[in-house]
């Protein structure tokens, strides 16, 4: 009986811990993460204080923090080829990272680190040097900076069959040296690395290439981590938020369902589906059942995004900053519709898949610069600073915990819906105007459209909509309007 009771208790503890790993630990009503891709730590700290905190962003996903291989031309993907777990990269050193985490936490913006637990670097001819000066011999699987030796890796093999579980989880993803996460030594070094980041105040982790690691191994690693650091404003016994990169298009041998109980999972079907819809390949009317109705994961288990740093570089349905009108419309819908744990992208300009982040002649990453309206101008795209996007972050905060109601569509690609009695969104993706009296569900009054402008000193700088005593307002979105969206919420009432 004692053994049975003990087993039950252990199962309950594990289940509780797993559930806790779905909690992103946001402040107040904040509920949107931004990925500041390849930004320096000092610049992220300033952005938290000057923009993200005041605009109500909940958190930042940062690029990998540990030492990586130095590759010719400094492509972005060198950050995904570890040499050691020393906290020195082109984004800064450990002191600068710790300062950034502290400053962001102080203004209510949580930090989530992109971590590489699956592998080390790819092959390199001879001695490779990392961003902290560590040397390694990747061809011999020798990484003294950790240290790892060949005994800590799976035997080398290529992934040629993506339906072969052994290949997917024990062979080398694009030639990257594949760690053996069942090894006690490897586990200890990974846990030590993650625990150090927790000590510095991070709120959680985006786990790169999670599907290439056995779920049981990841479960052991996650459950062995320390609680979050209460000195950074986290409650006692808070567990790190985990969201895992698992690419699953619905026909994968290694599926998302193996990982969604361990933490949230990146819902790539969301990205593809929303891209298809706003590119005009699917009528927007079908988005009424968006989310689980489309076969997506349960809302609290899905990390959702229009694009990410990988798929924005691929040809296909996925939208990126190069299609700005459709991208802003898709992002507005993403942040208005009550599904998923939302992340928005903040990119740098690229002409090909390997383009490096903006850098100077010494190959040092440069800081973003801003024009008089706050937009980035020197190679950084900064979608999160586009008014149409940061305004929808505010919309999402204003309508948090409300339900979708009063869906309307024209049978094609003009849609609208309410979020409780706090918000209203209308979208026009047709080649003709939307001009319609629509139920906004809002209290009577005049509301500023936060897409075309904002509420400043008691008046609207863009469009406005007058809502009558029955909740109806006249919405007009021209087919040739700069933006195909209209958004109203209670915090933008005149």
From Swiss-Prot:
GO MF terms, alphabetically ordered: alpha-amylase activity; metal ion binding
Catalytic residues in the record: 208, 245
Signal sequence extent: 1-20
Superkingdom assignment: Eukaryota
UniProt name for this protein: Alpha-amylase-related protein
UniProt keyword terms in alphabetical order: Calcium, Carbohydrate metabolism, Chloride, Disulfide bond, Glycosidase, Hydrolase, Metal-binding, Pyrrolidone carboxylic acid, Secreted, Signal
GO annotation, cellular component aspect: extracellular region
Native source organism of the sequence: Drosophila bipectinata (Fruit fly)
Record has Disulfide bond as a keyword: yes
Free-text remark on how the cofactor is bound: Binds 1 Ca(2+) ion per subunit.
SMART domains: Aamy, Aamy_C
EC number annotated for this UniProt entry: 3.2.1.1
Cofactor(s) this protein cannot do without: Ca(2+); chloride
UniProt similarity note: Belongs to the glycosyl hydrolase 13 family.
Binding-site residues for Ca(2+), renumbered to this chain: 118, 169, 178, 212
């Amino acid at each position: 009986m004692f053994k049975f009771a003990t087993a039950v208790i252990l199962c309950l503890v594990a289940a509780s811990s797993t559930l806790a790993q779905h909690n992103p630990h946001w402040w107040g009503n904040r509920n949107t993460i931004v990925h500041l891709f390849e930004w320096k730590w000092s610049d992220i700290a300033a952005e938290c204080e000057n923009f993200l905190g005041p605009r109500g962003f909940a958190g930042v996903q940062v690029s990998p923090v540990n030492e990586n291989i130095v590759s010719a031309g400094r492509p972005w993907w060198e950050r995904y080829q570890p040499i050691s777990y020393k906290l020195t990269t082109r984004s800064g050193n450990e002191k600068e990272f710790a300062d950034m985490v502290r400053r962001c936490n102080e203004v209510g913006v949580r930090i989530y680190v992109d971590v590489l637990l699956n592998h080390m670097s790819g092959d390199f001819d001879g001695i490779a040097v990392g961003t902290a000066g560590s040397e390694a011999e990747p061809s011999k699987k020798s990484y003294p900076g950790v240290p790892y030796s060949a005994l800590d890796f799976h035997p080398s093999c290529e992934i040629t069959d993506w339906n072969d579980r052994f290949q997917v989880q024990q062979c080398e993803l694009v030639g990257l040296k594949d760690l053996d996460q069942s090894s006690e030594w490897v586990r200890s070094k990974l846990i030590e690395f993650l625990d150090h980041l927790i000590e510095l105040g991070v709120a959680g982790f985006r786990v790169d290439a999670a599907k290439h690691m056995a779920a049981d191994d990841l479960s052991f690693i996650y459950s062995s981590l320390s609680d979050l650091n209460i000195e950074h404003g986290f409650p006692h016994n808070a567990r790190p938020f985990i969201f895992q990169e698992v690419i699953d298009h619905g026909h994968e041998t290694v599926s998302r369902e193996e990982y969604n109980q361990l933490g949230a999972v990146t819902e790539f079907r969301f990205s593809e589906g929303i891209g298809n819809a706003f590119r005009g390949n699917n009528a927007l009317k079908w988005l009424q059942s968006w989310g689980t109705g489309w076969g997506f994961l349960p809302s609290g288990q899905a990390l959702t995004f229009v694009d990410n740093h990988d798929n924005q570089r691929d040809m296909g349905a996925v939208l990126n900053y190069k299609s700005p009108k459709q991208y802003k419309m898709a992002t507005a819908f993403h942040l208005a519709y009550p599904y998923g744990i939302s992340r928005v992208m903040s990119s740098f300009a690229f002409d090909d898949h390997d383009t490096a982040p903006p850098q100077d002649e010494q190959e040092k990453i440069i800081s973003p610069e801003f024009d008089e309206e706050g937009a980035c101008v020197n190679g950084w795209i900064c979608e999160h600073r586009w008014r149409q996007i940061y305004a929808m972050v505010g919309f999402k905060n204003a309508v948090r915990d409300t339900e979708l109601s009063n869906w309307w569509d024209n049978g094609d690609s003009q849609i609208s819906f309410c979020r409780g009695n706090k918000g209203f969104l209308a979208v026009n993706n047709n080649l003709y105007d939307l001009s319609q009296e629509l139920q906004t569900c809002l209290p009577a009054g005049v509301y500023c459209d936060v897409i075309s402008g904002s509420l400043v000193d008691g008046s609207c700088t863009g469009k406005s909509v007058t809502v009558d005593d029955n909740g109806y307002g006249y919405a007009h979105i021209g087919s040739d309007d700069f933006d195909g969206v209209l958004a109203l919420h209670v915090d933008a009432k005149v």
